[in-house]
């Protein structure tokens, strides 16, 4: 920029995402992202200690589930706390999608964007009550932002 305020700032977009999104943008003027209908966080030490999770468990901790959304309809459970700062540590941990391990919330979001489409059926591996459970889910679509 002329003021050099953005000097040195760069962004990287994975080429696989570009190959997936650009044709839809050209053809339709938009791209519709898949949606699970959850909010989540990383599996951190505090969560492991409060719930007694295995020390090597990784995944995406489900803090909220959108009512009547894909995850809710599939039976995925979010934390019952009313605020992020008031978690009860009783939500599910998503550990895999379609047998691909999810090590973080970023992994989950990236996997959905690069490998799935709205309306697609996926298999979700979750850790709940000290055991692994698998559920099937049909992905929704993320509403466009204006």
Model-derived regions: residue spans:
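C-terminal recognition in membrane/secretory proteostasis and scaffolding
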Residues: 17-146
């Amino acid at each position: 920029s002329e003021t050099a305020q953005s000097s040195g700032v760069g962004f990287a977009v994975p080429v696989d995402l570009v190959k997936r999104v650009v044709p839809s943008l050209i053809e339709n003027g938009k791209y519709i992202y898949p949606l699970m209908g959850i909010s989540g966080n990383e599996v951190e030490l505090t969560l492991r200690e409060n719930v007694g999770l295995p020390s090597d468990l990784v995944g995406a901790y489900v803090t909220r589930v959108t009512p009547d959304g894909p995850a809710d309809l599939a039976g995925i459970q979010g934390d019952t706390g009313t605020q992020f700062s008031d978690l009860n540590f009783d939500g599910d941990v998503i550990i895999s999608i379609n047998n691909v391990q999810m090590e973080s919330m970023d992994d989950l979001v990236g996997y959905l964007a690069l490998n799935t489409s709205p309306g697609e059926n996926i298999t979700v591996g979750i850790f709940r009550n000290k055991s692994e459970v698998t559920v099937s889910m049909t992905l929704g679509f993320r509403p466009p932002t204006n």
